[in-house]
Swiss-Prot record:
A zinc finger (CCHC-type) spans 126-143, 148-165. It is found in: Cytoplasm. Residues 38-104 form the CSD domain. The lineage of its organism: Eukaryota, Metazoa, Ecdysozoa, Arthropoda, Hexapoda. This is Protein lin-28 homolog.
Amino acid sequence: MENVQLENGLERRTTSQSSTSSANPANLASPTEECGCVRLGKCKWFNVAKGWGFLTPNDGGQEVFVHQSVIQMSGFRSLGEQEEVEFECQRTSRGLEATRVSSRHGGSCQGSTYRPRINRRTRRMRCYNCGEFANHIASECALGPQPKRCHRCRGEDHLHADCPHKNVTQSHSNSKSISNNSSSSAAQEKSEEAT
């Protein structure tokens, strides 16, 4: 439906469709939310592991999404809870998104005190210099060059391949496996006799 109004001798045409679209809440964004002007606000929350969070503007507008890539600071970029910032934002299909975030006076942000937890297993390897299971290799060993010795018993009169303790531990494991085999064969014989 089309409405015609006369203003100062000029014809002004409006359609009912445009009047309903102006009532749409998505189109009622204030000019400060749409422009790239500098706004002040606080960090509502920020997930340091995922690298994003939300800002609450001081002027009471809609919350603004912030990604770590737009935060101005060196090193690990994050925001502390309730940290005061100044930011620029733009409207996207998902809502308001920050395009630049800095400290209140335009400098680097302070950032969060938390760091994401890294699920990294420590790799334990044997240092062939000191013989310890540690997180270093022989070229990085703090003890310096050591004399050749057995890494199993630390004896300096022989090497690991010729260690007398190696045979003792092998004979114990062999005797255990032999006794396990004999007991399992005896159990099989008893079950066969019962049937």
